[in-house]
């Protein structure tokens, strides 16, 4: 038994000795080859970048660490930089790329590399590359493609084929990157992104990968994710927030979740800071989805092209303070199709899908001192051919919106808008249908903005057909209704509610208001819509004012002339001055009362002092 145990121990000693010897030999070989191959690998990597980019990029780093046992490489203090001289030469020849990249990072990891394959087989094979918290400058340049008699049409593989036979990387990860989008012309940062993650799946560069239609730029996919985007608008009046943005090149998708544009100040305070009448926006979009995005075209030509853009579960609040003086600009330039022209990126969206969008347009009336809101809830439908691309416009110059919604929380609305995308006068047409509605539900709007209270009235349907432009609108309306009665109001003062104009209300209902359409025994009346648009009127204002005028004409109020914007502004200014004078009068009155009370107190104190002195003398 003793001899058997002693033999077993000897065997284990031999095994242990062999293992230790192998480790020592392997370690020695690893150290030797690391020293021997380090400069070779260093030069190979630099050559791949330099030759593969046609001398446009150079790669430099402080040091490289090799571990042949694990097949890993760690590179310290890396800088990938473009050669501006080469880029400028390419601009002249019309071969310069739209974007340049400048990348800095402290450490780069390359794992599971087959080191010997690089030297003996001229093939790079590795498991993955990891870039942790890099700083990336993406530099946009407006470049022009010019025909040139001498052009290198070789593929990327053909350019490196003298150095390498293939490059195969199973994965590339960029983790928690900071990305600055920079103007090449000015050097200004156009946008900045933090916490960006990028995943590149299965990069293969060989003689066949160029023609592989399942790949995007030699990869099986390039996906990205960005979380917690936050920025302040240039005028510092809004905060922009996005929860997440994700996308996939092969899937041709971009998904945005939790987009918000938040005003920095409350409605009235916000409007007074802008000095003139300007819209205040408060936006919250839960889901924004692009599908069918052409990433090739976006990267090469800077053109956004997508099959669809879907906006789902969104709230858009717009506020206008009519107390402020009108600005000098013309808001027709902010009409949807005019704003589309000004986009810095050429864009074509085949179909813009709206699903469950709630819009609230609010105006503050300084005469009534109340806010009136037009609610358009559950807006759903499609807008076709949303484009500012000249090629697309040459084929079809119209964008068509076909939409359904719940109007002012009282009736169903269907509207079709036809935008002329080439019109210089913002021309468009719209026609629609409004279903059954209890007109009393219009009171929150009519009381605040028109000082009219509806006592009763039932709408069966409204049909309208309108042509519009930056000058205004012209059209017709047929409104079927009955049992209409109203009250005319006058504004309250000092925060008091509006009061009824009794006699005028009676006269209006008796002599002016037509309580039904069609009237008994008569055909249905059609109303003409004529709206002269003031320069300060927004697109939404033009829509609802046109419909409002048609309703006004139908019920008989058309014989009462409407004030022009200038006249309306004079009334507002006069009313504000009157209120200011009253406030000053009340302030002076309060000061006088306070002074009188003070004088009375002083007299009482003087009398008490006299009595006290007389008493002491006696």
Give the location of each predicted region:
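N-terminal type II signal-anchor transmembrane helix
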Residues: 2-55
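Extended terminal
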Residues: 2-18, 420, 433, 446, ...
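Flexible beta-edge/linker motif
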Residues: 39, 47, 52-143, 157-185, ...
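Flexible, solvent-exposed coil segments and beta strand-coil junctions
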Residues: 84-91, 148-157, 223, 265-272, ...
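Outer-membrane beta-barrel translocator domains and adjoining extracellular loop/strand segments
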Residues: 88, 142-143, 267-271, 322-324, ...
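Short, surface-exposed polybasic-and-hydrophobic patches located at secondary-structure transitions
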Residues: 126-135, 147-155, 159-161, 189-204, ...
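Flexible, surface-exposed loop regions and adjacent strand-edge segments
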Residues: 143-151, 324-329, 450, 492-499
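Interface amphipathic segments
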Residues: 205-250, 256-270, 370-450
